[in-house]
Regions:
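A structural signal for short, hydrophobic/glycine-enriched beta-strand patches
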Residues: 88-246, 259
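Internal/C-terminal transmembrane anchor helices
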Residues: 69-93
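Structural motif marking the loop-to-transmembrane transition
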Residues: 2-9, 71, 239, 243, ...
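Membrane-embedded alpha-helical segments of integral membrane proteins
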Residues: 8-62
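Membrane-interfacial, low-structure loops and terminal tails that flank and connect transmembrane helices
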Residues: 1-2, 61-71
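Short hydrophobic alpha-helical membrane-anchoring segments
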Residues: 21-28, 86-94
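Short, low-complexity, Pro/Ser/Thr/Gly-rich segments in the mature regions of secreted, periplasmic
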Residues: 251-259
Length: 260
C-alpha cells in the first residue's frame, strides 16, 4: 500500500512538473507572440511527459508486449539510445553555453553588438538589454569603438543597427565611436560584415561580441569561423523567454555544426 501511494505521489509530481513546464514555454507566445522551435519542442515534450505519466500502466503493457518480438526490441533499443544521446548532447551544449555566458573579456577591444528585433522604430526589450550592456562597457572604456550590426526586417521601420546607434547615443556614447553595419540578416552575416568594417577602419581582428548569454557560445563559434579573435560580453535575458531561447539555441548550434 505504501509503495502504491509513493508511486501515485511521484506520478502526481511529474504531472505538475509537466504542467508547469508547459506554462513556462507558453509564456513567450502569450506575452510577445513568440512561437519557434524552442517553445514548440518544449511544450511538446511537456505534453508527452504528462501523457506518459497519466497512461503509465498502459505504456508499461505496450512496451512489455513490444519487447517480446525481435523487431520490437530493436525499436525500443533505438528509441532508448536516441533519447539518451539526445539528453547527453543537450547537457554538453548547455555546459558549453553556460561557460561562454559566464566568461568575461580579458582585454578591451572593439565591441560588435549583434542585433535582434526592432518594434517599429524602437528597439525591443531584448535589443535594449544588449544596448545597455554595450553602453556600460563603452562608458567604462572611453577609447573603445563599437560596431552595431543588424539589418532591417520586413516589419521594421529602421534597421536594427540604426535603432542601436540611436539608443547608444541616448545613453551618452559619442556618435564618432559608433560604426554601423546595417546589411546583415543572420549571425554569420553580422560577424562577416562587421569584420569587413573593422578592416576598413584599421581596427584589426580582435573584438568583443555582445549578445544575450544563451547565444554567446554559437556567436563565438561563428566569429572564430570568419577569422575574428573574439571574446564575449553577455547581456541578460528576460526570465520568461530564456527557456524557449535556450532550447532553440540547441537546434541552432546543432544545425551550424552539421553545415560545417
Amino acid at each position: 500500500m505504501r509503495t502504491l501511494t509513493l508511486r501515485r505521489v511521484a506520478r502526481g509530481v511529474l504531472v505538475l512538473v509537466a504542467v508547469y513546464g508547459f506554462w513556462v514555454f507558453l509564456q513567450p507566445l502569450t506575452i510577445a507572440g513568440i512561437l519557434n522551435v524552442g517553445n514548440a519542442v518544449g511544450m511538446g515534450a511537456c505534453v508527452l511527459l504528462a501523457g506518459v505519466v497519466v497512461a503509465w500502466p498502459r505504456v508499461v503493457r505496450f512496451v512489455s508486449a513490444l519487447v517480446k518480438r525481435r523487431s520490437g526490441r530493436l525499436v525500443v533499443g533505438v528509441v532508448a539510445v536516441i533519447a539518451v544521446l539526445g539528453v547527453v548532447w543537450c547537457g554538453v551544449l548547455s555546459a558549453r553555453m553556460v561557460g561562454a555566458m559566464r566568461a568575461e573579456p580579458e582585454e578591451p577591444a572593439t565591441l560588435i553588438v549583434l542585433g535582434c528585433k526592432v518594434e517599429g522604430d524602437r528597439p525591443s526589450v531584448a535589443l535594449l538589454r544588449r544596448v545597455d550592456t554595450a553602453a556600460d562597457y563603452l562608458l567604462a572604456h572611453p577609447s573603445v569603438q563599437v560596431v552595431v550590426s543588424g539589418g532591417q526586417g520586413a516589419d521594421e521601420l529602421i534597421s536594427e543597427a540604426e535603432a542601436m546607434r540611436r539608443a547608444l547615443v541616448d545613453r551618452g556614447v559619442a556618435e564618432d565611436r559608433i560604426l554601423v553595419e546595417d546589411r546583415s540578416t543572420s549571425t554569420l552575416e553580422n560577424l562577416t560584415f562587421s569584420k569587413e568594417i573593422l578592416a576598413e577602419n584599421g581596427l584589426g581582428t580582435s573584438a568583443i561580441v555582445v549578445s544575450e548569454g544563451y547565444h554567446m557560445y554559437r556567436a563565438l563559434r561563428v566569429a572564430d569561423r570568419v577569422g575574428l579573435d573574439a571574446e564575449g560580453l553577455a547581456a541578460p535575458s528576460a526570465a520568461w523567454v530564456l527557456p524557449t531561447s535556450w532550447v532553440r539555441e540547441w537546434f541552432g548550434i546543432t544545425l551550424d555544426g552539421l553545415k560545417g
